Every structure is written in C-alpha cells, then in structure tokens.
C-alpha cells in the first residue's frame, strides 16, 4: 500500500508488486489492508494541509495508559540526576545521601498501601513486578503444588507469564467475568484445589475500569492455603488500598500511572512470603532484586504516591464528575452504542463500543482533532485482534473492534468534555454514513 499526497487530499493506492509467494497475503500486507480500510473512511475529507498545519492543543484522555510527571514530583527528582547523583549502594557521602532518599521513598510507598517498609521491593515497573510475583511463587512453592488461578481478562504481563508457566508444566485455571466485568469469589471457591499455590486477580481492569472484590477473593485463596497476588497498577493512587486488611500477599504497582516517572515500580511482598528472585546479579533490594537503584525514579515514585493518596478523594470526585457528564452526553447524543463495565469502577474510566464502525477509524479521526484516547490496553494496542477483555464481557466479536476507552485525569476540564463529545458525535455520524454494516442495519429496520 502507498499513501499518496494530492493537491486536494490524500489517498491510498495499491502497490504494483506481484502477489506474495504462495498466493497468500503476508503479515505486513494484512496489517496494511486493515489500515487501508480504516483510514479510507476518513481520508475523503482530509487534506494534506490539515496534517501539515495541525497545531491543536491535545486533549489527553488516555490516563490509563500513562500520566504526565507531576511538576512537584519532578522537582524532587531533579537533584538526584546531578548534585546528588551518588549510587545508593556506595559507602561514601553521596551514596549515603542517595540511600537515605531511597529509604524515605520506600516508607512513602509502604504507608500508601498499609505495608511495612521492608515489604517494598523496587522494580522497573508493573510488568517486572507481575513476572516476579508469578514466576517467583510458582518456582519457590512448586513442591506444594503446580496449580495457579487467574482471570481471563488480566493484563498481558500476567496472561503471558501464565502461558510461560503452563509451558513449564504448571496448570492454570481461568476465572470468568460476568457481563458487568467482575469475577466471582463463588467461582474461585468452585475451582480452587488442594494443589493451588497462587491466585492472581487484577485489582482494577485496565480497559473497562471495573474494581474487583479483592478482599473476598483473598479470603477464598487463604482458606485453601494459596497465596493471593493482585496487579494493582491501575488501582494504586486511584483506590484506597490496605494490603493487611484486604489479605493481599503480593501487589504490583507502577509509578507512571499516578503522575510519577516511567520505568519505576515495586512489588509488595508480605513478610514471610518468599518468592524466588527473578533477576540475578548484585545484592540490591535486600538481595532480592539485582540492579543499580534508580534513585531519581524511586524518589519520584515516593512523592507521587504520597501526593496521589493524600489528594485521592478530592481528585476522584472531580474526575468522576467529568466522566459522568461525558457518559451522559454520549448516551444521549450517539445511538447504537454499548457502555461497558459496571458501576464500581475507576473514577476516570469510560469505555464504549460503537456499533458498525472500527475503533481505529474513530481514534484516527479524534487524533486529528487533538483528542487522545485508546482502543484498549496500551501494552497490546498494536494487536489486530479484538480485546480479550471486551470479548470476555460478552461483546460480540463483530462489534468488539468498535470499542474505545476514554480515561480522564485531574488536568481535564468540562470544556474538554464538551469538545470531545462534539467531535465524537461528528466522527461517529460520518463514519457510519460510509459503513456498509450501518447501511445494512438501517435497511433492515426500514423493512420492518
């Protein structure tokens, strides 16, 4: 496929190469064909000038993918890039200063989730923490059993790690979700076994935002002698968490989800729980996680989580008001949609399925209008497959590709809501006017 610029607009033209070897389309060509179909729906009204002179302010509605570093947090980090740049493992003065800063951040993180400082282990982020929790428990406790339980709509960091463990000979059972996006403690009770050593269920879903019954699930796991892990990457800083009261044995988090820096996270490991270490090397993190300590990142994470927790109720009330107004307006103004997920969800999350059109086309058009949203998990947004989460809650496969996630943050405004709804309404109308599926459905209604 070739994108050709013309005086009056843009168009896709097919390449002149002979068919792929064997007569079948190669993977690259299949990708381009999908892009071609989606983009052709919007390029008819787009000119090259639109792209070259687009200077719109971005309206960022993808806070579940990442957040900007808070200015105050950044100011706390900066000294540790230069004048306080010592290695926290060094014994000289600059090293000791760095160690003090790391210890302070460790306490800030621990206090935020009701843990003890010696239960916090810094990592590179959520994916490493998930890998360490799952592989570490599986390998350390396999003599007690080789059965693991998770849910069918976890983050890829959990699902793909479980696949690796299955390849090693572990058995994995998957909890289902109901149409509202919640797993059931009753189902967990029905599938847990004497040889189950770990249950892992995410705290809040990264796509539809539903908050799971963590305390109930942990009670079931413990009643049968299993550990309980939760991927709380989306929840930390947005939901009040008390690992002791909720019975959590291991918890993963990542700073960039609560206005901290990227590349830093941690794994909470309850005292007495001993997963096998994931990364071999030096003796950092009390000899449990090798690698030079990312002091600026750790410092930023500590201050970010402290600020997020201290202002959580106020921020959530503000963000939920934006989200609720957005949802109300979309439901009133755009027909043939599905609002995904139940009421107990993250304050900023709104997830819709728009029937008869592709999510990629919606996102492309919104992007041109300066609106940043997402078709689902940022860690799997390059996949051409429909979202596993959306399929798991019962959205038909033919509709699932039309799903969009909007996630609001504390810098958004009601003006952002109004502008986004206006642009979304125009976008959906125009794309449906060119959709054969929409035309077919309209014709059927007319015949009836």
Regions found by a protein language model. Give the residues of each.
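Pyridoxal 5′-phosphate
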Residues: 57-448
